[in-house]
């Protein structure tokens, strides 16, 4: 045996000081060419113009008690054939390995090893001219028990860092945005306000990126909370979609937001799923105005711009003549609109149910200001806490599920034939409902992200 080689067994404890890994159990396999280490939430980014990668490592098999956040320079991307014969393109990093009293630099590919028996595989390239393998032995360089390993990680697990969450919006001073930032920071997370207009995309099959004005790359986020104003729907959803392609969790997905923002499409989806809505009509030509009015039971009726929110672009036409004038005026501007039956018995009131993760976490009754028929808070309406019926609760939950929204403000109106769905909002305001109920809605939104990402405070 050469003097500079040492014997290792079929499994050994390794360390990677540069990655902050004091102990990780490795399967030693001279039949495998490359070495790999467990990595999840792998995200490429640039540092001083060079390619780097960030990733999370759970160093103990079958345990998420310890989570390490690692960064390393990328030296390559390679197609690696896994043990099941599948080809996977992996990032390759280099780091110094410590085995017993020996240390040298090895190359590691990053991959999810949750389905494997070991968090690390030590292949023959890493062992070349360094070791001899005795497959009949284990832990030739020393065994460590669970208590010893947890003690090695004690400082890191006690000081576990929070998540990095981006708030994708337009105005940092709005009540809702301030509350979300505040709620995240109170829970120990790093909250980053991202102005939608200052984000831009790099479309690249191997290195997609989201940039922020000034050159900062945003690929290192754990999650984004899209709060997209209607005028920014197209670009905001494109940004959200790009974050999703980087395996960054979106509290509401781009597809769900797109569905909910298209009022006609959303009503069609609700109708398809047998959810009750006010009778509505849609036509392309002013020639069909009279039939459209008759379709919803005649005047009085509601005329809605498809692009409107917060009660804007909604008109009550009290007579047939007024309805014809409003519809034809809107059509002359080449805008899309809906006509909808007017629910007189609601008396200027509606319900807002706030849904998070399939639960109605809060509900309020909104009442229109004197002389106004719209109950929206932004139109001067008032809010009061209300207890909703089981039917109303189920309607709200089914509506959010139909849209695919994890977080939704569902508007319901009480009619003589039962509760009817008015609208599902993917960026519902927090001020009215938090003020009326005293419930920490912003905190519940952060809780949803923590639950989805499996994050728990120590």
Curated annotation (Swiss-Prot):
Mn(2+) 1 binds at residues 411, 423. Keywords: ATP-binding, Ligase, Magnesium, Manganese, Metal-binding, Nucleotide-binding, Protein biosynthesis. The keyword Cell membrane does not apply. Residues 267-450 form the ATP-grasp domain. PROSITE patterns: ATP_GRASP. Mg(2+) 1 binds at residues 411, 423. It comes from the Bacteria. One of its GO terms (biological process) is translation. Its EC number is 6.3.2.-. Mg(2+) 2 binds at residues 423, 425. Pfam families: RimK (PF08443), Rimk_N (PF18030), Zn_protease (PF05618). Residues 1-162 are annotated as: Unknown. It is an enzyme of class 6 (ligase). Mn(2+) 2 binds at residues 423, 425. Binds 2 magnesium or manganese ions per subunit. Its cofactor is Mg(2+); Mn(2+). GO terms for molecular function: ATP binding; metal ion binding; ribosomal S6-glutamic acid ligase activity. HAMAP family: RimK. PANTHER family: RIBOSOMAL PROTEIN BS6--L-GLUTAMATE LIGASE (PTHR21621:SF7), RIBOSOMAL PROTEIN S6 MODIFICATION PROTEIN (PTHR21621). In the C-terminal section; belongs to the RimK family. This is Probable alpha-L-glutamate ligase. It comes from Shewanella halifaxensis (strain HAW-EB4).
């Amino acid at each position: 045996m050469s003097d500079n080689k040492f014997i290792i067994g079929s499994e050994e404890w390794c360390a990677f000081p540069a990655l902050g890994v004091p102990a990780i159990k490795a399967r030693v396999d001279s039949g495998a060419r490359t070495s790999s280490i467990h990595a999840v939430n792998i995200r490429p980014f640039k540092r001083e113009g060079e390619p780097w990668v960030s990733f999370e490592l759970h160093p103990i098999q079958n345990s998420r008690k310890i989570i390490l956040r690692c960064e390393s320079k990328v030296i390559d991307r390679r197609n690696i054939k896994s043990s099941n014969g599948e080809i996977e393109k992996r990032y390759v990093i280099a780091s110094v390995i410590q085995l017993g009293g020996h240390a040298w630099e090895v190359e590691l590919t990053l991959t999810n090893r949750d389905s494997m028996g070991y968090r690390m595989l030590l292949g023959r390239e890493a062992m070349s001219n360094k070791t001899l393998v005795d497959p009949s032995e284990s832990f030739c360089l020393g065994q460590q028990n669970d208590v010893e390993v947890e003690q090695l990680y004690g400082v890191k697990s006690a000081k576990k860092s929070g998540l990095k969450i981006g708030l994708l919006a337009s105005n940092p001073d709005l009540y809702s945005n301030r509350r979300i930032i505040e709620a995240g920071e109170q829970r120990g997370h790093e909250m980053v306000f991202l102005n939608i207009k200052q984000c831009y995309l790099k479309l690249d099959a191997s290195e997609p990126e989201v940039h922020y004005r000034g050159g900062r790359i945003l690929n290192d986020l754990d999650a984004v909370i899209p709060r997209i104003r209607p005028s920014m729907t197209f670009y905001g959803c494109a940004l959200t979609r790009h974050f999703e392609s980087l395996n960054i969790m979106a509290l509401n997905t781009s597809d769900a937001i797109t569905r909910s923002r298209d009022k006609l499409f959303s009503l069609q989806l609700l109708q398809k799923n047998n959810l009750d809505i006010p009778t509505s009509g849609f036509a392309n030509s002013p020639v069909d105005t009279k039939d459209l009015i008759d379709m919803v039971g005649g005047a009085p009726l509601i005329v809605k711009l498809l692009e409107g929110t917060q009660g804007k672009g909604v008109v009550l036409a009290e007579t047939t003549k007024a309805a014809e004038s409003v519809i034809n005026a809107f059509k002359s501007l080449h805008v899309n609109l809906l006509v909808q039956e007017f629910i007189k018995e609601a008396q200027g009131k509606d319900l807002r149910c706030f849904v998070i993760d399939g639960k109605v976490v809060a509900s309020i009754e909104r009442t229109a200001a004197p002389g106004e028929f719209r109950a929206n808070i932004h139109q001067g309406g008032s809010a009061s806490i209300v207890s909703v019926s089981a039917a109303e609760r189920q309607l709200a939950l089914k509506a959010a599920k139909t849209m695919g929204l994890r977080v939704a403000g569902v508007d319901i109106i009480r009619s003589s034939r039962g509760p009817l769905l008015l609208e599902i909002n993917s960026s519902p305001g927090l001020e009215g409902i938090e003020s009326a109920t005293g419930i920490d809605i912003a905190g519940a939104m952060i809780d949803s992200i923590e639950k989805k990402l499996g994050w728990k405070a120590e």
